[in-house]
Amino acid sequence: MANQKFDLVALSELEARAKEHHFLKSFAKSVEILRGVLAMRLILQGDRHFQTINARSGLARSLRAIHQYDECFMLYSENIRIHTDKLGPDHPQTLRSLSRLANTYFAAGQYENARPMFVGILASRIKVLGRDHPDTPRSRSSLANTLSELGMYRESAVLHQEIIDDRVRVLGPDHPRTQLSRLRFEIVRKAIHSA
């Protein structure tokens, strides 16, 4: 038992080191470390333990940074399966895992796959978390950005305007997130006039 506790502490230290590598953009090193951490967590803690789930998510994040999307899809899908089974489909953690998968589809340029996921995530977050929870405007923004990539500029502009209105109300007109939303709205507005 003492060895297992030592192993778990060592794994946490390795994960912290992998996060540092990710932060420093040494993604390949982060992936290398996290593959080992995940393998050991699966052995010591099983696939459903929260630290195993976090290790799987961290590995997927670093893989996404080096465009290894297929493995990311698999890792995030496994976390979604486990979260849905343990917590239910509308639990905030399940929705966070779904969002990570949808964002990976977006990063991979698979906008048609990302779009229905973002629609569902947004609807669930409004229902579960409410319109003003920080995750909700992020979901609306992800959907708006996806629609823009699909050339659906008018639909995207409507969502971006909703985001601006919500962020002005909740965060204030000068908050960096509000300013970013205005910038995205202007980009979409110009695309509408150019089309």
Located regions from the model:
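Intrinsic-disorder-linked linear interaction elements in eukaryotic regulatory proteins
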Residues: 1-195
